[in-house]
């Protein structure tokens, strides 16, 4: 596929839409042939504000040092990053706030069990922001539409890469309306119910608006 990225970026800006690009980390040096800084500089020059490096190596000290350089060079060129795959937050964002979030927790595309997703707020989220790549509405794996939407409130992270497994966004109504209205940063948080692996209900406030999200396992329960 031949894609004129500068033209796509220009068209998006014309419509008031920014572009976040997925970049396969395997093509970047030393794992691939392309120089990281040259790629970042080129994309920034085209007007790309955000990147999502994926398939990144993160299992050794050398890998993490490479990731730190990746983030540092992105900061130099004023690029926001969301690191995909297995890297778990380790405090790097304190130095480089352009690292908005990262996956590192078995994202939704892996179709994890509900018990896994109900443990994340008590485990993975303790170390930093998390992009779970939630599905806007799949109706799969015994999950309901509201369960999927609640992740946008419960999971901590200023960027959630919401997936649409069925294609056209025009077929969604209230899901899309909620997605467009839910904030990405919060002023206050209250935990209303918390049973690791079973259920979690959290209220978050942005300005004067409160949002409440609840996720539950297969057992019915009433929360007051």
Where are these regions (language model features)?
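Conserved active-site and cofactor/substrate-binding residues in soluble primary-metabolism enzymes
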Residues: 145-149
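Aromatic- and carboxylate-enriched substrate-binding clefts and catalytic-loop regions
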Residues: 1-144
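Carbohydrate-binding surface patches
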Residues: 195-224
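A mature extracytoplasmic/lumenal domain signature
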Residues: 57, 166-168, 216
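Active/binding-pocket-proximal capping segment
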Residues: 89, 169-175, 218-221
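Extracellular glycoside hydrolase catalytic/binding regions
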Residues: 101-110, 183-190, 195-196
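Hydrophobic, well-ordered secondary-structure elements that form the walls
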Residues: 81, 154, 212
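Catalytic cores of secreted or luminal carbohydrate-active enzymes
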Residues: 150-192
């Amino acid at each position: 596929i031949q894609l004129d990225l500068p033209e796509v970026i220009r068209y998006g800006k014309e419509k008031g839409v920014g572009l976040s690009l997925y970049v396969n980390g395997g093509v970047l040096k030393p794992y691939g042939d392309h120089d990281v800084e040259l790629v970042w500089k080129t994309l920034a020059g085209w007007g790309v504000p955000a990147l999502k490096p994926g398939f990144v190596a993160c299992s050794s000290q050398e890998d993490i040092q490479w990731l730190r350089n990746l983030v540092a060079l992105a900061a130099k060129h004023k690029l926001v990053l969301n690191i995909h795959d297995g890297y778990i937050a380790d405090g790097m964002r304190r130095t480089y706030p352009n690292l908005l979030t990262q996956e590192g927790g078995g994202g939704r595309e892996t179709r994890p069990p509900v018990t896994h997703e109900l443990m994340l707020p008590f485990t993975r989220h303790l170390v930093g922001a998390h992009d779970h790549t939630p599905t806007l509405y799949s109706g799969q794996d015994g999950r309901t539409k509201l369960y999927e939407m609640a992740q946008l409130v419960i999971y901590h992270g200023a960027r959630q890469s919401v997936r649409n497994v069925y294609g056209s966004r025009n077929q969604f109504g209230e899901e899309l309306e909620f997605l467009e209205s839910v904030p990405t940063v919060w002023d206050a948080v209250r935990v209303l119910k918390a049973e690791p692996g079973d259920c979690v209900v959290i209220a978050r406030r942005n300005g004067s608006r409160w949002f409440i999200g609840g996720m539950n396992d297969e057992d019915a329960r009433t929360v007051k």
